[in-house]
Amino acid sequence: MTDPHTARTIVGIVGNVISFGLFCAPIPTMVKIWKMKSVSEFKPDPYVATVLNCMMWTFYGLPFVQPDSLLVITINGTGLFMELVYVTIFFVFATSPVRRKITIAMVIEVIFMAVVIFCTMYFLHTTKQRSMLIGILCIVFNVIMYAAPLTVMKLVIKTKSVKYMPFFLSLANFMNGVVWVIYACLKFDPYILIPNGLGSLSGIIQLIIYITYYKTTNWNDDDEDKEKRYSNAGIELGQA
């Protein structure tokens, strides 16, 4: 019989694979931006936001904050690198006002993380205290980011069309949440459990909406418009 530690490691590896797939979801958008040499109507906001989310989760997984969380570090460290690449691509091909917006946002995020790290290491002296503070912050940021799928779901209901909500990405979001919920339960971690429990709920609602409105969808509309709407909603997120 597999012991809980081994089972947790296996589940965490599966979670890493699914989350990596979600982090890869924006690649077609980035390729299109690169070919056009312009960001067009695509927005950098979801990628800039995910940078902070990944930084926070990577810090959370460090042994002096939450011990035995290596798999949280690996996927969010990887995600952080990928999101920084995406943001860089936006910066290179964006207009001056958008570049200024990206620069200001990134500076604010770096300063915020520096303050969080300093306060955590200087004022909190146990992993229990540190994991509580960072864990709560991670939950808050994740809940805020779940507002993006709500925007897409509202659009689907309004238009009675699922072309703005790809099925496999919705399914992957659901599976990602479920896997990390299992991971959090094998060695109880409320800070991973809560946001991914909400992610699972969001995923299942997306799937129900997809099934409900699939038959009423007009698939002949402009695919490029669909991609812009979906990318700008910032739903392509993967996290622990």
From Swiss-Prot:
Keyword terms, alphabetized: Cell membrane, Membrane, Repeat, Sugar transport, Transmembrane, Transmembrane helix, Transport
Gene3D superfamilies noted in UniProt: 1.20.1280.290
Cytoplasmic side, ranges: 31-45, 94-103, 153-165, 212-240
Induction: Slightly induced by the powdery mildew fungus G.cichoracearum and the pathogenic bacteria P.syringae pv. tomato.
Chief location of this protein within or outside the cell: membrane
A Gene Ontology cellular-component term: plasma membrane
MtN3/slv domain: residues covered: 10-95, 133-217
Any GO MF annotation of the entry: sugar transmembrane transporter activity
Extracellular topological segments: 1-9, 67-72, 125-131, 187-190
Pfam families: MtN3_slv (PF03083)
Membrane-traversing stretches: 10-30, 46-66, 73-93, 104-124, 132-152, 166-186, 191-211
Subcellular location field: Cell membrane
Bilayer topology annotation: Multi-pass membrane protein
UniProt GO BP: protein homooligomerization
Domain of life where this protein originates: Eukaryota
Protein family according to the UniProt entry: Belongs to the SWEET sugar transporter family.
Record PANTHER family: BIDIRECTIONAL SUGAR TRANSPORTER SWEET5, RAG1-ACTIVATING PROTEIN 1
Assembly mode: Forms homooligomers and heterooligomers with SWEET6, SWEET8, SWEET9, SWEET11 and SWEET12.
Function, as annotated: Mediates both low-affinity uptake and efflux of sugar across the plasma membrane. May play roles in nurturing the male gametophyte.
Protein name as annotated: Bidirectional sugar transporter SWEET5
Originating species: Arabidopsis thaliana
Gene: SWEET5
